[in-house]
């Protein structure tokens, strides 16, 4: 989640991931990701979607908005209508099981994780995410779902492009401890 220019999707593909589903809502970054995936001949291992993740709905994004990372999802008055999917919808759509989830979506992690069902979260053996506005609710939700969670303490970051420019950023690593029988 938060494919940006495709570098992480390419990394996981080169590290023998079965298949990578990469979501990037910004058309500008999405187009660069397409080029990078083609340059690495990974079109058959990476499904790149010009969609976002979080709370289900739509946003409008200017197609020429040059977001190359570090900004939250903006809703423009004019532009391309971009679909936003919940984690439950994504898990069901791609029939995900025993997957890994990487989340770096500049704030969408809260809607994505806090509103996900236990069933959707249990589709993932490992979750690594960057958080932007605190970790406590995310850690609590993952622990309630049966994950063993480690996290880095937040560091202050000022991002003038973000809706809330004063952020406390860090990483969360979660490992699923729930036994799945399927």
Label the predicted regions.
Residues 1-182:
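Phosphate/nucleotide-binding beta-alpha loop and adjacent structural elements of enzyme active sites
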């Amino acid at each position: 989640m938060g494919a940006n220019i495709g570098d992480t999707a390419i990394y996981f593909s080169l590290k023998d991931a079965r298949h990578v589903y990469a979501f990037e809502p910004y058309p500008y970054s999405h187009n660069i990701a397409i080029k990078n995936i083609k340059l690495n001949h990974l079109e058959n291992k990476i499904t790149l979607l010009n969609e976002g993740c979080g709370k289900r709905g739509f946003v409008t994004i200017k197609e020429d908005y040059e977001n190359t990372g570090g900004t939250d999802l903006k809703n423009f008055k004019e532009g391309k209508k971009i679909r936003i999917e919940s984690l439950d919808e994504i898990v069901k759509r791609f029939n995900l099981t025993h997957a890994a989830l990487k989340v770096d979506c500049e704030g969408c992690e809260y809607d994505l994780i806090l509103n996900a069902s236990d069933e959707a979260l249990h589709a993932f053996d490992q979750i690594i995410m960057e958080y932007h506005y605190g970790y406590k609710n995310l850690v609590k939700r993952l622990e309630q779902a049966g994950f063993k969670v480690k996290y880095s303490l937040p560091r202050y970051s000022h991002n003038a492009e973000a809706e809330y420019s004063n952020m406390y950023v860090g990483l969360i690593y979660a490992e699923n401890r729930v036994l799945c029988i399927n």
